[in-house]
Amino acid sequence: MAGAKLLRPASVAKVELSPGGLQTLTLRHGETTETVSARWIVDASGRAAVLARKQGWWRHNAEHPTAAAWSRWKGVKDWDSRELAEKYPEWATAVYGIRNTATNHVIGDGWWSWWIPLKGGDVSVGIVFDQRLVEFPHDEGKLGERLKNFLMQHPVGREMLADAQFEESDVHWRKNLAYYSTTFADDGLVLVGDAAGFIDPFYSPGMDWISFSASAAAELITAQRRGEPMAERIARHNRDFALSYRSWFESLYKDKYEYMGEWDLMSTAFRLDLGLYYLGPVSHIYKYGPRGLLTPLFSLPRSRPAFHLIRTYNRRFAQIARRRRRANALGKTNRGRRCLIPSFTLSRGDSRRLFGALAKWAWIELTEGWRSWGQRPQETAAASSVSAKDVAEETMVRSHS
């Protein structure tokens, strides 16, 4: 029988796995309990990661101890309002686009925040921070109040949230965001999306992760239905996704929060990250179509040079930022600077823009980075004494449509 049967609301009460055989689910649906058997189970349970936790595959990524707090707000100011334009003329003329219908990011030392307009005029505002670098207030009132107080240490947050009120029924906190599964598939089960792993919401990599993992899951299932041998396919699937997760984390995210609030370092990394993303994964998918989604990022040998390049400049920028932190020199190049760039496209000419970013990296190394050449990279320190207020006027605001 073709098609799909949707049960809603429903919850999984029990899972019985039989690799190579039929998998059995016990479901609670309304007032009834139902048992369903199938050759394959696809776990798309998100952060609940039902199968990874049940099988003991779930692991916390201790190298990336981020946390997040967020809420829905009323009364957030309009980024494009006449009030702000008259009060801050340079702010109003900095961009040609409309900020208020875009997702805006306000960034500081060890943290970043999102500002997402919602239907009806409300705004989702939240922060993500590295717990080794930022001490988020824990015992100073309601979570929404603490979130507002934290953001109001930044001049943009202070202006935008001056008259805003959080929705008390829609305030959230999540600790230790990053995790992964040590196994991504077996003969009869496959994990997709956040059920397989999560790194960081910055750059929204979850959209890529679900695209690659769901496409590869569908290919596994159809291969089995065609009668193909599964052992090597499943082994390769697990190998590819484990390598992809680790490479994605090490290249883009490991210790990135160390330099996130440094305009020169972060704006250079942003250009390189974005340009290489279009030059690599995006162009690959446009070239090969759906087949390009069957192999996750950084799992092919030809992608390893790009991985090493991205990991290298990310490590270097983190090390330079640590040296600045020790010298109490964070944010010294930030005042009056903003990172506003045209987006990349698939045009070959856009790849030339990468040379400018690479030249900027070289300049940073020659003028400052050389002081840490040959030094062993240090681990990110425990929570810094540098607060959001200390670098409030020396942080970067980024907005994109």
Predicted feature locations:
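Predominantly flavin-linked oxidoreductase catalytic cores and closely associated redox partners
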Residues: 2-157
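Short, surface-exposed, charge-dense and proline/glycine-enriched linear segments
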Residues: 36-37, 41, 90-101, 188-198, ...
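Alpha-helix boundary/capping detector
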Residues: 67-68, 77-78, 177, 263-267
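A general structural signal for short secondary-structure boundary/capping elements
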Residues: 86-92, 161-163, 173-174, 236-238, ...
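FAD/FMN-dependent oxidoreductases across multiple families
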Residues: 109-113, 117, 131-220, 224-253
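C-terminal helical "tail/cap" subdomain of flavin- and related membrane-associated enzymes
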Residues: 220-396, 400
